[in-house]
Amino acid sequence: MKQVRLLPPAPVRAVCALAVAALAGCAQIPRDPIIQQPMTAQPPMPMSMQAPGSIYNPGYAGRPLFEDQRPRNIGDILTIMIAENINATKSSGANTNRQGNTDFSVPTAGFLGGLFAKANMSAAGANKFAATGGASAANTFNGTITVTVTNVLPNGNLVVSGEKQMLINQGNEFVRFSGVVNPNTISGANSVYSTQVADAKIEYSSKGYINEAETMGWLQRFFLNIAPW
């Protein structure tokens, strides 16, 4: 009789632990942020100029003497007033009704008497379909975030992006913003509403065990896709 040699208990437990850890690591599907551009930018170093020996220095890296505080260079900051309120409603309905009736008789030969003297045939059918559907969505997002000018387009528009992180209890909250700002829409308080930003991307996400508990695992997604009910 051939003897089967089993692995020692310790290696078996180690292999099982590694398998469970691998499945646990695959339970959460990583989500890529919708904003892929850099969140900040460093302003270029100004060219060194010889000091003129007066109070006004044209080579000063700050603002000129007669210029407002609106951003216009890479590295300048801007406050975004997030005021998004989107409502959408959709409804649809369909109703169809169709009926049909057919009746005809087939005479037979005379020598076929009894039940076969005359054959009658009739057919009737009806088809009815009624369906209704509706959907509604409402999203509101209010807040403020300060972003950095990461690029200046040839027409003068500013490409901005920024990120705000907040660690609250056991969760890390992220607010990311990016878009293209027209300098003419910037107020004197160095702020602009998000509704006036082109190509705006606003992302609010979190990391932590609460977010992981609210995320469906990959195995659940698999059975959800193949389940016929």
Swiss-Prot record:
One of its GO terms (molecular function) is cytoskeletal motor activity. It comes from Burkholderia ambifaria (strain ATCC BAA-244 / DSM 16087 / CCUG 44356 / LMG 19182 / AMMD). A lipid is attached at residue 26 (S-diacylglycerol cysteine). PANTHER family: FLAGELLAR L-RING PROTEIN (PTHR34933:SF3). The keyword Signal applies. Its main location: membrane. Pfam families: FlgH. Belongs to the FlgH family. It is found in: Cell outer membrane; Bacterial flagellum basal body. GO terms for biological process: bacterial-type flagellum-dependent cell motility. It comes from the Bacteria. The basal body constitutes a major portion of the flagellar organelle and consists of four rings (L,P,S, and M) mounted on a central rod. Keywords: Bacterial flagellum, Cell outer membrane, Lipoprotein, Membrane, Palmitate, Signal. This is Flagellar L-ring protein. The gene is flgH. The keyword Signal applies. A lipid is attached at residue 26 (N-palmitoyl cysteine). HAMAP family: FlgH. Assembles around the rod to form the L-ring and probably protects the motor/basal body from shearing forces during rotation. InterPro entries: Flag_Lring.
